[in-house]
C-alpha cells in the first residue's frame, strides 16, 4: 500500500490499485478536483437566486418614505409612484371666530337666524367664510367643533344649534334672567364628507342686545 496523498482542500485521497490496494491520485486527478472545488465556490455568485419578481409588490418595513410633489390634489393628498397616498402639510385645517361688537342683528340675520361673527382669530386652510359665518369641510374626516354664544342684557332664553348641512346636530341653552351675560356652550365631534357645511343658528329667543365675546371654533382631527 502506498502512502496516502492530499487532494484539493487539504483532504487525503486514496485510490484503489491493481490488486485492491489504495494509491495516490495522479496529477490530472488533482487538477480536476481543484477545478470542481472552484466551480462550486463560484456558482452562487454567477447565478443569484431572485427573491421577488417584477410583478410582486414592494414591502417596506421599518422605513420612512418622504414624497415631494409641487402639485398635490385638492384634498391635500399626494400619491407617489409606488401608489402610496401621503397627506401633505397643507392638509391642516382649523378656524376660530369671535364677535367683537354688540351690534344688533342685521335683516339677513333675523331672516336666517344665522349667528354671525365679525373677526377671525385662526383660519388655517381658509375654509371658514367670515361673511356667511359658515365652515365648509375640505375633505372627509372627523372634525371637532365648539361654540360659546353670549347673550348680553337679554332676559329671554336662547337656544343655539350647531347645524350640519341645514340640520341641527347639538344645541345649547342660556336662560338665567338674573345675570347680564350668559353663554350657551357645547361641543361635538362630527364625521363630515367633503363640502359639508357647518354653522350656528339661533333656534329660540333673540340676540337683540348683542353677542359680544361669543366664539365659534373647529378643526380637523384626522382625515378618512
Swiss-Prot record:
InterPro entries registered for this protein in UniProt: C1q_dom (IPR001073), Cerebellin_Synaptic_Org (IPR050822), Tumour_necrosis_fac-like_dom (IPR008983)
Keywords linked to the UniProt accession: Disulfide bond, Glycoprotein, Secreted, Signal
Gene3D superfamilies membership: 2.60.120.40
SUPFAM superfamilies assigned: TNF-like (SSF49842)
Repeat found in the keyword field: no
Glycosylated residue positions: 53, 110
Location of this chain's protein in the cell: Secreted
Pfam families documented for this protein: C1q
Domain C1q: 88-224
Nucleus among keywords: no
GO biological process: maintenance of synapse structure; positive regulation of synapse assembly; spontaneous synaptic transmission; synapse assembly; synapse organization; trans-synaptic signaling, modulating synaptic transmission
GO terms under cellular component: extracellular space; glutamatergic synapse; synapse; synaptic cleft; trans-synaptic protein complex
Signal peptide positions on this chain: 1-51
Subunit structure: Homohexamer; disulfide-linked homotrimers. The trimers are assembled via the globular C1q domains. The trimers associate via N-terminal cysteine residues to form disulfide-linked hexamers. May form homooligomers or heterooligomers with CBLN1 and CBLN3 prior to secretion. Once secreted, does not interact with other CBLN family members. Interacts with GRID2, and more weakly with GRID1. Interacts with NRXN1 and NRXN2 long and short isoforms produced by alternative promoter usage. Weakly interacts with NRXN3 short isoform and not at all with NRXN3 long isoform.
PANTHER family with a match to the protein in the record: CEREBELLIN-2 (PTHR22923:SF50), CEREBELLIN-RELATED (PTHR22923)
Role description: Acts as a synaptic organizer in specific subsets of neurons in the brain. Essential for long-term maintenance but not establishment of excitatory synapses. Functions as part of a trans-synaptic complex by binding to postsynaptic GRID1 and presynaptic neurexins. This interaction helps regulate the activity of NMDA and AMPA receptors at hippocampal synapses without affecting synapse formation. NRXN1B-CBLN2-GRID1 complex transduce presynaptic signals into postsynaptic NMDAR response. NRXN3B-CBLN2-GRID1 complex transduce presynaptic signals into postsynaptic AMPAR response.
This protein's name: Cerebellin-2
Organism: Homo sapiens
Amino acid at each position: 500500500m502506498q502512502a496516502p496523498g492530499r487532494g484539493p482542500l487539504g483532504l487525503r485521497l486514496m485510490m484503489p490499485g491493481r490488486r485492491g490496494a489504495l494509491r495516490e491520485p495522479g496529477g490530472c486527478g488533482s487538477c480536476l478536483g481543484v477545478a470542481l472545488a472552484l466551480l462550486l465556490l463560484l456558482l452562487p455568485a454567477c447565478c443569484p437566486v431572485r427573491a421577488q419578481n417584477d410583478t410582486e409588490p414592494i414591502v417596506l418595513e421599518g422605513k420612512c418614505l418622504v414624497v415631494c410633489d409641487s402639485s398635490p390634489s385638492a384634498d391635500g393628498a399626494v400619491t407617489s409612484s409606488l401608489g402610496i397616498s401621503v397627506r401633505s402639510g397643507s392638509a391642516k385645517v382649523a378656524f376660530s371666530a369671535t364677535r367683537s361688537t354688540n351690534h344688533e342683528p342685521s335683516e339677513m340675520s333675523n331672516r336666517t337666524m344665522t349667528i354671525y361673527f365679525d373677526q377671525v382669530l385662526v383660519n388655517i386652510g381658509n375654509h371658514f367664510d367670515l361673511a356667511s359665518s359658515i365652515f365648509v369641510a375640505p375633505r372627509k374626516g372627523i372634525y371637532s367643533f365648539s361654540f360659546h354664544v353670549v347673550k348680553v342684557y337679554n332676559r329671554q332664553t336662547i337656544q343655539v344649534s350647531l347645524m350640519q348641512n341645514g340640520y341641527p346636530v347639538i344645541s345649547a341653552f342660556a336662560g338665567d334672567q338674573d345675570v347680564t351675560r350668559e353663554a350657551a356652550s357645547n361641543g361635538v365631534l362630527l364625521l363630515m364628507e367633503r363640502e359639508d357645511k357647518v354653522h350656528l343658528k339661533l333656534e329660540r329667543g333673540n340676540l337683540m342686545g348683542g353677542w359680544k365675546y361669543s366664539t365659534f371654533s373647529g378643526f380637523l382631527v384626522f382625515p378618512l
